[in-house]
């Protein structure tokens, strides 16, 4: 049985750990709030850009954009896995990387060649341990990541797709739906999918395009791809902070419960020791008398 001093030492150790996890929870809460504000601010722009492209979708067959290329057969796919640079965020990294692993195996089973790209130190170390060769790796997808990092990534993959080095580009990342709902998903960013909105003959205000709809659409397509990258990165960062906040809250609560259990154990051991000492004193007194 542990001595009161040993139990007291362990209680103090758990209390110190609880201070750390509580601080990390508070920091993650603040960062999650800031990150979700960025997601919410970027969403209207991304939605409006998509809506404008959809309104011009009937022109997709007459423009010659490399980003609309649809190969007869998918021979090679580029997968970008976006994980975190740090841990202590529950199943955020493990769930995502498991999905990446399954997707790679699924494509290879169909005879499709896969090239893997990783963003985040956790993803990089995962693939290194699994002996998966990475074509590119990035560690700058974090709180400071924004349009510049997203545009750099988008430009690289747009070039890979345009010169037919790959037939499809997929991003596997954690999507943010709400503060209580985030989950890893696969997004096919290239070839660009043209979604038609509305029906033919539907009433609505007449829209005038300058210089002309075809030119506007050709310039909008790269913009849509880049805004998709921005959206994915911002959602991944926000989801990471939410996952870390939840994990640190769970750790703080668990530490609190452990402190209660250890305190009760400490009191029992201390009480037993006092009772034993009293019994020894009484026994000694009776022996003398």
Curated annotation (Swiss-Prot):
Superkingdom of origin: Bacteria
Keyword Cell membrane attributed: yes
Alphabetical GO biological process terms: proton motive force-driven plasma membrane ATP synthesis
Chain ranges passing through the membrane: none
Compartments reported by the entry: Cell inner membrane
SUPFAM superfamilies tied to this protein: ATP synthase (F1-ATPase), gamma subunit (SSF52943)
PROSITE patterns hit by this protein: ATPASE_GAMMA
Keywords in alphabetical order: ATP synthesis, Cell inner membrane, Cell membrane, CF(1), Hydrogen ion transport, Ion transport, Membrane, Transport
GO molecular function annotation: ATP binding; proton-transporting ATP synthase activity, rotational mechanism
Keyword Cell membrane appears in the UniProt entry: yes
Coarse class of the protein's main subcellular location: membrane
GO CC list: plasma membrane; proton-transporting ATP synthase complex
Bilayer topology: Peripheral membrane protein
One Pfam entry name: ATP-synt
Annotated function: Produces ATP from ADP in the presence of a proton gradient across the membrane. The gamma chain is believed to be important in regulating ATPase activity and the flow of protons through the CF(0) complex.
Assembly notes: F-type ATPases have 2 components, CF(1) - the catalytic core - and CF(0) - the membrane proton channel. CF(1) has five subunits: alpha(3), beta(3), gamma(1), delta(1), epsilon(1). CF(0) has three main subunits: a, b and c.
Family membership: Belongs to the ATPase gamma chain family.
Protein name: ATP synthase gamma chain
Protein's organism: Leptospira biflexa serovar Patoc (strain Patoc 1 / ATCC 23582 / Paris)
Lineage, top ranks: Bacteria, Pseudomonadati, Spirochaetota, Spirochaetia, Leptospirales
